[in-house]
C-alpha cells in the first residue's frame, strides 16, 4: 500500500471464541495510526501486542457503533491512556461517546476518571463530518443501519489514494457516493455464501463473502497493494 497499510487485529463476530472480534489499525506512510473499533474486551491488548503495536502508539481511534463486540474493548484502550498518561482522541457519533463516557466514569478508578478530558478527548461526529489523523484525512458517514446508529468512513492518504470502510453491515446504495471509486474497500462478510444456511447472516444484517466480491468491482475498487 505504498507505505500505507492495514493491520487486522480481529475478524470474528460477537460470539467468536477462537479469534478476536473484528477491529483493525490503519497506518499511514508517515507512521500515524488510527485504531478502528476495539472488540469486546481486554483481548485488544493481547492483539496489539501480537501485532507488534505498542499501546502508546495508539493516539486516535474511531468507533463505528455501540455493539458490545466493537465498543467494550475501547474501555481498555481509554484506561491504558489514562493509567500510563498519554493522549488519546476518540472519534464517533453521540450515542457511542455518551456510552463511553458513562461507562468510564462508573467503572474506572477515580484517579483515572479525573484525567478524562485532559488526556482523553471524545470528539462527536455528525453524518459527513471530517477529521484528520496526521497525514490522513477522514470523512465519516451514516451507513443507514436499521438496527443501530452506525458510521463508516473514508480515509484519504497523502498520496491521494482513498480507502472506504463500510462499517459492520453490507454495502448500502445510499452510501455509494463514499464507496464509489475507493482504491481499497473494507466490506464485512459474516461467512461464505456456501455456509449461508448454517450461519444465517441475512437475519443479522450481515452478508457473505460473495456479496463482498460482487460489490467490489461494481464500486470500481481495486483492493490491491499499491506498487
Would you name each region that the model predicts?
Residues 42-91:
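Active-site metal-binding motif and surrounding structural segment of the metallo-beta-lactamase
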Residues 2-11, 106, 133-138:
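Short Pro/Gly-enriched beta-strand edge/turn motifs at strand-loop
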Residues 84-88, 96-122:
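Active-site neighborhood of divalent metal-dependent phosphoester bond hydrolases
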Residues 35-39, 59-69, 93, 163-169, ...:
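Active-site neighborhood of phospho(di)ester-bond hydrolases with catalytic His/Asp-centered motifs
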Residues 16-18, 124-193:
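Active-site-proximal loop/helix segment associated with metal-binding centers of metalloenzymes
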Residues 32, 84-88, 215-221:
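A short helix->loop->beta-strand "cap" motif at the edges of active sites that frequently abuts
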Residues 170-227:
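Cap/insert and terminal regions of metallo-dependent hydrolase folds
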Residues 2-50, 150-168, 184:
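Conserved beta-strand hairpin/beta-sheet module of binuclear metal-dependent hydrolase folds
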Amino acid at each position: 500500500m505504498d507505505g500505507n497499510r492495514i493491520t487486522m487485529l480481529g475478524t470474528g463476530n460477537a460470539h467468536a471464541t477462537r479469534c478476536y472480534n473484528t477491529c483493525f489499525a490503519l497506518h499511514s506512510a508517515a507512521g500515524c495510526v488510527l485504531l478502528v473499533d476495539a472488540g469486546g474486551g481486554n483481548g485488544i491488548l493481547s492483539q496489539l501486542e501480537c501485532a507488534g503495536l505498542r499501546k502508546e502508539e495508539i493516539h486516535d481511534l474511531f468507533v463505528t457503533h455501540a455493539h458490545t463486540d466493537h465498543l467494550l474493548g475501547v474501555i481498555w484502550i481509554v484506561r491504558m491512556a489514562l493509567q500510563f498518561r498519554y493522549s488519546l482522541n476518540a472519534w464517533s457519533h453521540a450515542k457511542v461517546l455518551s456510552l463511553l463516557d458513562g461507562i468510564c466514569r462508573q467503572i474506572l478508578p477515580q484517579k483515572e476518571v479525573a484525567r478524562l478530558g485532559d488526556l482523553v478527548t471524545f470528539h462527536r461526529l455528525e453524518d459527513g463530518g471530517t477529521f484528520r489523523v496526521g497525514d490522513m484525512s477522514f470523512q465519516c458517514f451514516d451507513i443507514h443501519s436499521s438496527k443501530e446508529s452506525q458510521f463508516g468512513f473514508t480515509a484519504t492518504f497523502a498520496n491521494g489514494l482513498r480507502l472506504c470502510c463500510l462499517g459492520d453491515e453490507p454495502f448500502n446504495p445510499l452510501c455509494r457516493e463514499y464507496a464509489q471509486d475507493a482504491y481499497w474497500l473494507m466490506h464485512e462478510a459474516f461467512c461464505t455464501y456456501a455456509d449461508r444456511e448454517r450461519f444465517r447472516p441475512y437475519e443479522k444484517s450481515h452478508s457473505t463473502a460473495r456479496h463482498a466480491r460482487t460489490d467490489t468491482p461494481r464500486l470500481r475498487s481495486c483492493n490491491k497493494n499499491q506498487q
